[in-house]
A protein has these predicted regions:
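C-terminal catalytic histidine-bearing segment of alpha/beta-hydrolase fold enzymes
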Residues: 295-298, 302-347
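Short beta-strand element of the alpha/beta-hydrolase
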Residues: 108-118
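Hydrolase active-site cap/lid region
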Residues: 204-255
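N-terminal targeting or regulatory segments adjacent to alpha/beta-hydrolase or S9 domains
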Residues: 2-80
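Alpha/beta-hydrolase active-site loop
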Residues: 163-184
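Short amphipathic alpha-helix adjacent to the substrate-entry channel of hydrolases
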Residues: 127-147
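N-terminal cap/lid segment of alpha/beta-hydrolase-fold proteins
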Residues: 61-107
């Protein structure tokens, strides 16, 4: 074999080797690129599948307000006007009771209270039939008040839910806050919250999500952590007797089995983010919601140096029936202190 043939063969071998090397390099790059795409896709899917009850998920949403629709003008109270109004939450028409002081409007508007009812069987609830005297006490003290019915209650659209296992009532409340802030007579820098029982539970979530609430008074609230409710005081909470059969528990397990999931839903994981002043009231003979839940919240807030007042009422029940006048006196003093014009200017 002459040198020319040998040289030609070597040339072919070198060219083939170079081509193979180039193919190998680009093939690996392509695989890496595809892997990166896969990782990004997986990451995106994980983000998309965040549970809607997670506190962070609720913080990242928007709750645009608008103008209340006046559905009916009711007879005036002692020192206030009252209206049945409606607003929109996730496209649903939600009704509520709005009260407005008859006094001249302050330069920057009246302070206002989101007033949240406790659990009432939705089919028995009515806009004007529940908590009217409670709301009137605040209205007579110079506060605009708005009590949203919540979805599935009274004439409001949508389906009622279990507040411990759904974000829907919190969403209705956050929309209500936006509408209340937009109301012409309201000073949007002086908004408080009042909640009883289930309304206390909703309120605790709301103050970890929104900084619009400057002061929250929670009466006999379901304000425990998920650990409190499922483990520590489960035997004292009748409304959790069927909790293990809810889809949220079936799909994700109990808090002690899947703490990572439940911690993201639990307002106790976000107590340090609370900017509102908190006031807690509870009767020692409450047989619906154990007083230990309010005691635990008080202790945790104090550890974080948060502003918290705590009142317990000896031998009193879930509605603080024997001490309701004292409890309201303390509540109104609390709002007067934390929702004054001077206080609002600090925010």
């Amino acid at each position: 074999m002459n040198k020319k043939i040998i040289f030609s063969i070597l040339k072919i071998i070198i060219i083939v080797a170079i081509l193979f090397l180039v193919f190998f390099i680009f093939s690996n790059k392509s695989k890496k690129y595809n892997t990166d795409i896969d990782k990004n896709f997986i990451s995106t899917k994980i983000e998309e599948t965040k549970h809607p009850m997670e506190i962070e998920s609720l913080r990242n949403r928007e709750y645009p307000g608008g103008d209340f629709i006046i559905e009916e003008k009711l007879s005036n109270g002692t020192n206030y006007e009252q209206y049945i109004v409606s607003y929109k939450s996730e496209g649903l028409k939600i009704y509520g009771l709005l009260t407005v002081p008859l006094a001249p409007k302050p330069e920057k508007g009246f302070p206002a209270i989101i007033f949240m009812h406790g659990y009432i069987p939705p089919q028995e609830y009515s806009t004007t039939g529940n908590y009217p005297t409670y709301q009137a006490r605040l209205a007579n003290s110079g506060y605009i008040t708005f009590k949203p019915d919540l979805r599935g209650h009274g004439n409001s659209e949508g389906e009622a839910v279990e507040s411990h296992f759904s974000e829907k009532y919190v969403v209705d409340t956050l929309y209500a806050i936006s509408y209340l802030k937009n109301y012409i007579a309201v000073d949007q820098n002086r908004i408080g919250y009042w909640g009883h029982s289930q309304g206390g539970e909703i309120g605790l979530r709301v103050v970890t999500i929104s900084q619009d609430i400057k002061a929250a008074s929670l009466w006999a609230g379901v304000v425990g952590s998920y650990k409190d409710m499922f483990e520590t005081y489960n035997d004292k909470i009748d409304f959790l007797e069927n909790a293990t059969s809810t889809s949220l528990v079936i799909e994700n397990g109990l808090p002690n089995k899947n703490p990572n999931f439940w911690n993201k839903l639990d307002p106790y994981s976000y107590l340090n983010d609370i900017h509102a002043s908190i006031q807690l009231h509870h009767g020692t003979k409450d047989d619906s919601v154990p007083i230990e839940l309010s005691m635990h919240l008080k202790e945790e807030l104090e550890k974080l140096n948060k502003s918290v007042e705590y009142y317990e009422y000896t031998e009193d029940d879930h509605n603080i029936s024997n001490n309701v006048n004292l409890a309201f006196q303390r509540t109104i003093e609390f709002y007067d202190k934390n929702l004054s014009v001077y206080t609002a200017e600090k925010y």
